[in-house]
C-alpha cells in the first residue's frame, strides 16, 4: 500500500475541488495512483468534482521585494476578494516576491519549480489551494537587476510599482512610484508609447474630428492635437506631478538632478475577464440536471 501524503491529497483537491476526506479515500483506494484517484472521484461525485483550476482568478495581490541590487514585483491571483486578504496567501506572495528577486527565475514555470519551505513553490501553492479551497495562481512577475537605485510602492495589495532611478534620495524614488500608482502612465516618455495605442487614439480622434464638419486641413490639425495631448497624458515624464501641480515629473526630476530609467506597474486582475454569475441560468441548469437523474 502506497503512503498517502498531505501534498498528494492537496494536489488531488486542487485538480478536482473535492472534499479533503474524499480525496484521501480516493487516493487510498487507488493505492496512490493520482490519475486513478481522480477518475474515482469523477465517478463518485460527478459534477461536484469540478476542477478548481478551471475557475477564473481575477482577484489577488501584488507583492514586492528589494534586496541588494535586485527588486521584484509579482502578481498572484485568487478567485475572491476575501481570500486576497488571507494571511497564508499574503505570506506566500511575499516569499514568492523574494524568490524572484534573489533567484532570478526565467519565467513562471521556473519560479514554480524553485525550492520553498522544504518543498517547491508549486507544491506550497497546491497545498494552499487545498487549505483555502480556491484556485490560486502566480500570474506574472518582473525583476530589475541594477547598480542604480530601486524604489517600490504598494497601494494596499492591489497596485504595485517598481522604479529604477538615479541621482535622487530615497524619498524622490518613493514619490515617483506613488505617482505612477495614482496616474498609471503606460510609458516613460511619449516616444515609448506603444504604436498600437497611438493608432487607436488617432482613430478615435479622427472619428470625433470628422463629425465637426470642418475643412480637412483643420481636421488634420485637430487629430494631431488630440494625439499629442494623449501622449503627454500617458507618458510619465510629461505627467503633472501629483504632489505638485506646478511641475511635471520631468521638471521635478531635473530639479533634483535625478532621472528615471524604467518602471513597472501591476494592477491586480488587469486584462482578466472576471466571470459574472448568472443566477437564473445557474438555477435552470440545476433543474435540467435534476430531470436527467
From Swiss-Prot:
PROSITE patterns: EF_TS_2
Claim: Glycosyltransferase is one of the keywords in the record: no
Pfam family, one: EF_TS
Keywords, in A-Z order: Cytoplasm, Elongation factor, Protein biosynthesis
Involved in Mg(2+) ion dislocation from EF-Tu: annotated span: 80-83
Signal peptide as annotated in the record: none
InterPro entries from the UniProt entry: EF-Ts_dimer_sf, Transl_elong_EFTs/EF1B, Transl_elong_EFTs/EF1B_dimer, Transl_elong_Ts_CS, UBA-like_sf
Presence of the UniProt keyword DNA damage in the record: no
Cellular compartments annotated: Cytoplasm
Main location: cytoplasm
Family: Belongs to the EF-Ts family.
NCBIfam families named among the record's database cross-references: tsf
Function of the protein: Associates with the EF-Tu.GDP complex and induces the exchange of GDP to GTP. It remains bound to the aminoacyl-tRNA.EF-Tu.GTP complex up to the GTP hydrolysis stage on the ribosome.
The name this protein goes by in its record: Elongation factor Ts
Gene, per the UniProt record: tsf
Amino acid at each position: 500500500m502506497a503512503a498517502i501524503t498531505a501534498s498528494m491529497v492537496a494536489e488531488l483537491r486542487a485538480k478536482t475541488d473535492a472534499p479533503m476526506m474524499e480525496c484521501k479515500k480516493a487516493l487510498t483506494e487507488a493505492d496512490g495512483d493520482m490519475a486513478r484517484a481522480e477518475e474515482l472521484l469523477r465517478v463518485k461525485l460527478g459534477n461536484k468534482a469540478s476542477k478548481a483550476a478551471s475557475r477564473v482568478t481575477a482577484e489577488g495581490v501584488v507583492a514586492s521585494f528589494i534586496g541588494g541590487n535586485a527588486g521584484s514585483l509579482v502578481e498572484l491571483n485568487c478567485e475572491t476578494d476575501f481570500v486576497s486578504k488571507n494571511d497564508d496567501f499574503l505570506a506566500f506572495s511575499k516569499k514568492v516576491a523574494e524568490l524572484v528577486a534573489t533567484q532570478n527565475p526565467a519565467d513562471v514555470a521556473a519560479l514554480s519549480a524553485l525550492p520553498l519551505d522544504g518543498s517547491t513553490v508549486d507544491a506550497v501553492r497546491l497545498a494552499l489551494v487545498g487549505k483555502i479551497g480556491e484556485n490560486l495562481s502566480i500570474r506574472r512577475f518582473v525583476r530589475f537587476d541594477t547598480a542604480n537605485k530601486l524604489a517600490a510602492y504598494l497601494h494596499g495589495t492591489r497596485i504595485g510599482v517598481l522604479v529604477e532611478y538615479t541621482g535622487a534620495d530615497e524619498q524622490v524614488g518613493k514619490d515617483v512610484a506613488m505617482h505612477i500608482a495614482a496616474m498609471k502612465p503606460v510609458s516613460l516618455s511619449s516616444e515609448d508609447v506603444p504604436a498600437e495605442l497611438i493608432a487607436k487614439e488617432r482613430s478615435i480622434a479622427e472619428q470625433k474630428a470628422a463629425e465637426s464638419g470642418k475643412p480637412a486641413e483643420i481636421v488634420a490639425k485637430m487629430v494631431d492635437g488630440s494625439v499629442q495631448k494623449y501622449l503627454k497624458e500617458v507618458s510619465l515624464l510629461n505627467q503633472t506631478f501629483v504632489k505638485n501641480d506646478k511641475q511635471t515629473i520631468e521638471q521635478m526630476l531635473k530639479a533634483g538632478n535625478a532621472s528615471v530609467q524604467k518602471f513597472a506597474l501591476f494592477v491586480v486582475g488587469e486584462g482578466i475577464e472576471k466571470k459574472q454569475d448568472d443566477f437564473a441560468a445557474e438555477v435552470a441548469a440545476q433543474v435540467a440536471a435534476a430531470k436527467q437523474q
